[in-house]
Amino acid sequence: MNSIDKTQRITQSDALPGRSTPMPVARLHVVHEHSMTHVPDHMSVAIFAMGCFWGAERLFWQQPGIYSTAAGYIGGYTPNPTYREVCSGQTDHAEAVRVVFDPATISYSQLLQLFWENHDPAQGMRQGGDIGSQYRSAIYTLTPEQEQAAQASLQRFQQAMRENSDGRAISTEIEPAGPFYYAEEDHQQYLHKNPNGYCGLGGIGVCLPPPR
């Protein structure tokens, strides 16, 4: 049996079958003590993939105006995957964070700034020492306005990289959000439960310029 190259995307026909039963989800976010699934009427949702979801989730829950965050899987084929399945490279999912936020306090543009400035968006199917398609950089949009803002921010960050003598091409994917599958309970708010746990999050020292 040939080993799987986890840095290569797979086709749907090669994906694991998954299951019809969703992962159990805790009722409350352990940091904010809000619902893990409900989105209040005045709130919005954003989804970002920027490497290991442990550090990415903490980055967002620490911001003002955040109602809840959740670690999960998106962008692949396998329904209701497990962490082990995602790590196998046979689901095509990315590790991601679902952010429920109050746009009156923190804007989507501010979330994009956090995204770009806190990881390396030009590493393809890896993030630092974390190697595999699950660690790819991606923005999953839920509205046309998010799509437009994300695309514009990519162009601004690419230009900022060039101006900082970084000629690499950004590999971040910007796609409409498909199903978001919650990760297992031990991955939710992981770095709150394990303050000394692994966090691979880190930017490249480039700031996102504001829109002109």
Swiss-Prot record:
Gene Ontology terms for molecular function: L-methionine-(S)-S-oxide reductase activity; peptide-methionine (S)-S-oxide reductase activity
Alphabetical UniProt keywords: Oxidoreductase
Enzyme class: oxidoreductase
Pfam families for the chain: PMSR (PF01625)
GO BP of this protein: cellular response to oxidative stress; protein modification process
Name of protein: Peptide methionine sulfoxide reductase MsrA
Source organism (scientific name): Pectobacterium atrosepticum (strain SCRI 1043 / ATCC BAA-672) (Erwinia carotovora subsp. atroseptica)
SUPFAM superfamilies: Peptide methionine sulfoxide reductase (SSF55068)
Annotated segments matching region Disordered: 1-21
Active-site residue numbers: 52
Bias type Polar residues, positions: 1-14
EC number: 1.8.4.11
Gene for this chain: msrA
Record keyword ATP-binding present: no
Keyword Aminoacyl-tRNA synthetase: no
Domain of life: Bacteria
Cysteines paired by S-S bonds: none
Family: Belongs to the MsrA Met sulfoxide reductase family.
Catalysed reaction equations from the record: L-methionyl-[protein] + [thioredoxin]-disulfide + H2O = L-methionyl-(S)-S-oxide-[protein] + [thioredoxin]-dithiol; [thioredoxin]-disulfide + L-methionine + H2O = L-methionine (S)-S-oxide + [thioredoxin]-dithiol
GO terms under cellular component: cytoplasm
Function: Has an important function as a repair enzyme for proteins that have been inactivated by oxidation. Catalyzes the reversible oxidation-reduction of methionine sulfoxide in proteins to methionine.
